[in-house]
Each structure stands twice: as C-alpha cells, then as structure tokens.
C-alpha cells in the first residue's frame, strides 16, 4: 500500500507558520494485529528493542525485539514486594528505568535495568507531606542520572548528586524529554502548537515552535540526530531538530496505523516500527513494520474527506477508525482522511464550507441535531437510490432507517442503532391487551400517581416530553409550517401534567435501583445492543413485555443512531467513492466488529440474528451480581 500526502513547512524564525512542502510515503510489510500484550499503557523504544507496560496491576514489563517479522517478546520482572506499583518507564543512554510507587505513595523508587540483568534501585524520593507524592504524567532520567517528573505544566528535576529539587515551569504540557549535544530538551504540547524547550538547571529557553493543531504528542525514536519524527493525532511528521522546520508529514490512517504509543526509525535501511494501542476491550498491542519509499512516490488514488464532530482528544469512534483503515488498505481507487470539527468555531467553519461547496465528502451524522436543516438546505445526498441497488437491500431493517426519511428521501445510513422502549410494572401489565394513549390514561387513573411515571419524579415538563414523543405529527403540520397546540387533546395532556406536578416526590432522586423497579409505573429502558436486550429479562426477575411510547393510534419505539452513522455531502464530486465507503459499513467485518466493541444492533437482519445466536450469557449487576439462566 503506497501513500502520499501534501505537507506543510514552517517559514521564518521562532514560531513556524505553515506552507506547502515535499511528500513522503511508507509501505507496510508487516503487521501483528494481536500481540500477547493486553491493554498497553506505555511503550518506550531503545536501539535494539522496545519495552511496554500495561494497565494490569503488577503486570511484568514486556521487551519486544526489532529486526524480524515475528518480534520476540520477553517478560521482565520489576516487582520486589507485593505492595509496590509500577507507575512509568523511561529509556535513555542504554538504560531502562522504572518508577515504582511504594509505602502507600510516600516513596518513589527509581530503578534501572541492564539488558539481560535485573532491576537495581538507583534513587528513592520521599514525600515531604502526609498526602504523599504526586507521580506525575511524565517520567524521565537523563545521561547524568538526573530525574525528571512532570505534573501539569511543571517539571520537577531531582539532582543526580544531591537529590535537590528544582521546579521548572513551561508554557504547556510536557510530553517528551530528549537529550542532545545541546543538553536536555522537552517537547511541549501548547494550546496552539508544538514547542521545544532547552532545560539547563533552573533555566529554560524556547528553541522553536510549530503552529499546528496538536493532540497526544509522541515521538518516534530516530537514528538520525538531525531530525525528529513526531506523532500528533493521526499525523506523522518529520521535523528539523535544530530549527523546527516541518520537512514532511503523512496520515497514519493511510499507513494502516492508529493510536501510536511509540516507534523506532532506522535511517540506514529506512525501516519504521510502530507500536499501537489496539481497539476493543482487550486492546492488545499492535506492532507494525514499514519501509519508507523514496521522495516522489505518488498516491494515485482520489482523496475522500470524512468530516467528523469528534472531540479535541479523539477524531472518530474506534469502529469508524477501523473501517477507514480497512478501506484505505483495500480500495484501489479512493482513500480517506479525517477532518475534525470538534467545537463551535469549527462547526461554523463547516457551515461556511457547505455554503461555498467545499464541505467534506462524507459527514459524521452521529449527533444529528442539524440533520433536518441540512436536508432542507440541500446539503445531503439521498441515499435511498444507492441502497436500492445495493446487494444488502433485502437484508436491511428498513423500518429503522425509515425513521429518518424526509419527504421520501433517506439522507443518512445508520449501520448500527439502539432502541428506547418502556416496561409497565407487572402489577398493571397483565391487564393490557392493546397499547395506546387511551390505555396509558386508564393506567394513570387506576394508579392515581401512587407510582411514579417515566422517572419524571413529579416534574410536569418531564412527563409532557415523554407523552409528546412520537406524536409531533398530531400537533405540527410541517408541510404547511403550522402548529396546533390549542386542541382538546393537547389540553388533556396539560391537565395530566398539572395533576402529576402535585405528586412531586422529593425523595425520588435518592431511590436505589430496587426502589425504581418498585415505584415506577412505566419505566423507560434503553437497549444499546443485543446483550443489554437479552439480559434485560432480569429487570423484574422474569420476562415482561416491552411497549413503545403511546400515541392515539398505537405506539412508537425510540430509535437512535450509533457513532458510525454518516451521509454524503450533496456537493461532493466523488459521491460514488463516498458510497463505496458507506456501503462497506454494511459488510459483516464492520457490522460484527462494531457490535463486539461498541454499542449497537446491526442494521442487517441476518447479522442481527447471528449476533443474537452467538451472544453468551454474562454476569451483570442489579443490586447484586446475577447470572442469567438459559430459561431467562
């Protein structure tokens, strides 16, 4: 797989602005998707091997050798006493260091390890106050054995000889320490870019800054002393070490990489090793090996942009990230990059791009607040014609997708969905033959507010919101843009709410789960996936019927989309390519993978049945741990 990206080059002195630069590309020729190392927390790289620690309590340190297609993994024991806790590791000048918390946090021991040997204690740092020591977010030891611990924007340096503490304040979050011929340096994640600071004793000097959005800054160890490989979010950047000039950049998703913890690059043979945090609950360490190609290698595929409303720390959900990587590795005509619109400023920029015709080809519609507005303004493509000719057409649960149709058109695809329903207390449920608004009113008359309703706790607004769910069309004429809230039916709803308000329960917010089960006449239930649905039989201790929100004609169930919901920008010149990606979300590899990792029911009937048949009973908590029986 070849890849090419257009890069940005800082110009001028000090702060570096961005202009276009040359390209670089990598080809992957080894991938170990699931190593034996589960839930890695930190990886550091040396010249011959890397070391990894996990989130597992008292787990060993794992040593991973470079240089072959099946990296050898060895286990290194660091623990000398049961009460110890491994906090962090660091590598410098041929030594691996470990920071270990002891004595309930009142002592930190710094230990070092020589290849083939054992850990030996180098220094103990004692707490100066009763509350114990802050372990910090970054730990490092330089060639002279001075210890550095960062917390927030402050670095504390412990002198190798005297142990004297020196506090150093930086203009951002320290992420990586480096040692060069110029002394100790620190890469800092700032609000508007990446800064490099020189540290000499108490003195700090800013060497350069790159003005570029930064997230989860890491480095890839580089045998070339004149350049730095930096990782920020999904970007891999090559930077001039002395000036901060951005020489080249590529997108990790194009390389089939993601969530990089560390890496090692050897200039001599242009080999790059990347260590990545895997997806899913186990999150096994993924190890990839790449070869850098010569400059000028061109990406001949067409670029598609996936616009997401992610967060500042994460662009997209794990399932979409995996789908994009698979698409980039397999598709011969298109590749996808991600553009994140994570705050109000970015959202306004997206709306401006809609108006100018420059919006992303594919749009994340997980948070569909603007869905109707986007459709009305002509920003989204009707996907129904694409679905009608899809091989998956007859396997789709259409009544779920049809929830989102507007004027006969369907402008989003929800590969996964969740369901909101309600349960009626068994004391009253036996009398129900049909379920609609009249049945609901009859229940209320019998109950006389003895039990709460829909967890409204006596608040009229909550009850009105629930009773209007699924009934908007009874009161709002969207075609003629009129509303009728003075009807007899609406007045009846208001009277119910007024009566409900008088039953306000001050203690309801303190109810336990058992109290809720006993005191709720109608309990709202959200089923996020097959597991929550099948295990839900334990709610009342036996099976029970599920109902939708009552309407005059019957009932409606609530449906919500999951983080892989998306649509196609109407102005995209690459709609066919965008559809190829969206249709790939209906493939079994995505449908089942998503369900195994994230919440959601598959939108394909056949796969929903398979997932249901394959689901295993689990132990879950409702007051106390209970295991489902086969009968349940």
Explain the meaning of each model-derived region:
Residues 14-69, 89, 102, 175-183, ...:
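Conserved N-terminal structural module of periplasmic/extracytoplasmic solute-binding proteins
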Residues 397, 407-424, 430-498, 517, ...:
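Extracytoplasmic ligand-binding site segments that recognize negatively charged/polar headgroups
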Residues 22-24, 72-79, 120-127, 166-170, ...:
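Beta-propeller fold detector
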Residues 320, 560, 620-632:
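C-terminal capping/gating helix-and-loop segments adjacent to ligand/active sites or protein-protein/ligand interfaces
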Residues 479-511, 534-535, 547-549:
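Glycine-centered hinge/linker elements that transmit conformational signals in sensory
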Residues 537-613, 618, 626:
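Extracytoplasmic/periplasmic substrate-recognition and gating elements
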Residues 369-421, 432, 438, 543-551:
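Hinge/lid segment of periplasmic solute-binding proteins
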Residues 333-396, 432, 515-523, 536-540:
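Extracytoplasmic "Venus flytrap"/periplasmic binding protein-like
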């Amino acid at each position: 797989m070849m890849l090419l990206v257009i890069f940005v080059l800082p110009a001028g002195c000090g702060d570096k602005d961005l202009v276009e630069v040359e390209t670089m590309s990598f080809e992957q020729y080894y991938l170990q998707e699931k190593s034996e190392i589960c839930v890695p927390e930190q990886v550091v790289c040396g010249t011959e091997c890397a070391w990894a620690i996990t989130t597992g309590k008292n787990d060993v340190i794992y040593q991973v050798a470079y240089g072959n297609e099946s990296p050898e993994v060895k286990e290194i024991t660091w623990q000398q006493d049961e009460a110890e806790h491994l906090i962090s590791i660091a590598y410098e000048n041929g030594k691996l260091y470990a920071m270990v918390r002891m004595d309930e946090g009142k002592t930190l021991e710094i230990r070092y390890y020589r290849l083939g040997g054992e850990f030996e204690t180098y220094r103990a740092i004692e707490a100066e106050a009763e509350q114990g020591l802050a372990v910090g977010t970054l730990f490092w030891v330089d060639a002279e054995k001075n210890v550095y611990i960062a917390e927030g924007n402050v670095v504390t340096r412990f002198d190798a000889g005297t142990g004297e503490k020196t506090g150093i304040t930086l203009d951002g979050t320290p992420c990586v320490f480096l040692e060069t011929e110029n002394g100790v340096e620190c890469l800092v994640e700032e609000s508007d870019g990446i800064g490099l600071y020189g540290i000499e004793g108490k003195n700090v000097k800013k060497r350069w800054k790159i003005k570029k959005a930064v997230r989860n800054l890491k480095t890839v160890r580089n045998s070339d002393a004149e350049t730095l490989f930096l990782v920020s979010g999904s970007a891999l950047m090559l930077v001039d070490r002395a000036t901060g000039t951005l020489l080249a950049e590529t997108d990790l998703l194009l390389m089939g990489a993601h969530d990089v913890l560390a890496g090692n690059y050897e200039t001599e043979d242009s080999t790059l090793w990347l260590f990545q945090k895997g997806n899913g609950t186990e999150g096994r360490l993924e190890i990839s090996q790449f070869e850098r190609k010569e400059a000028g290698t061109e990406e001949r595929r067409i670029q598609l942009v996936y616009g997401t409303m992610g967060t500042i720390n994460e662009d997209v959900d794990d399932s979409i990230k995996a789908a994009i990587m698979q698409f980039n590795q397999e598709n011969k005509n298109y590749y996808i990059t991600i553009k994140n619109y994570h705050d109000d400023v970015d959202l306004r920029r997206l709306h401006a791009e809609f108006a100018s015709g420059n919006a992303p080809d594919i749009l994340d519609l997980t948070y569909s607040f603007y869905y109707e507005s986007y459709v009305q303004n002509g920003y989204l493509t009707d996907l129904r014609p694409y679905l009608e000719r899809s091989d998956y057409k007859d396997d789709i649960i259409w009544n779920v997708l049809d929830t989102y149709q507007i004027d006969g058109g369907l402008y989003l695809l929800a590969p996964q969905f969740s369901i909101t329903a309600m349960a009626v207390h068994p004391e009253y449920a036996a009398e129900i033959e049909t379920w609609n608004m009249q049945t609901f009113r009859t229940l209320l008359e019998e109950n006389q507010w003895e039990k709460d309703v829909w967890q409204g706790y006596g608040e009229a607004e909550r009850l009105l919101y629930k009773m209007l769910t699924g009934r908007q069309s009874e009161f709002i004429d969207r075609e003629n843009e009129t509303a009728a809230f003075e009807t007899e039916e609406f007045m009846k709803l208001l009277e119910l709410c007024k009566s409900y308000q008088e039953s306000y329960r001050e203690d309801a917010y303190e109810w336990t789960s058992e109290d809720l089960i006993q005191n709720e006449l109608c309990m709202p239930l959200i089923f996020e996936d097959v597991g929550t649905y099948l295990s839900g039989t334990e709610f009342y201790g036996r099976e029970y019927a599920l109902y939708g929100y009552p309407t005059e004609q019957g009932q409606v169930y609530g449906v919500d989309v999951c983080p892989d919901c998306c649509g196609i920008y109407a102005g995209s010149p690459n709609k066919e390519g965008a559809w190829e990606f969206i249709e790939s979300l209906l493939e079994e590899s995505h449908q089942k993978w998503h369900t195994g990792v994230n919440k959601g029911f598959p939108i394909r009937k056949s796969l929903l049945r398979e997932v249901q048949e394959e689901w295993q009973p689990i132990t879950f908590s409702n007051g106390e741990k209970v295991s489902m029986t086969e009968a349940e």
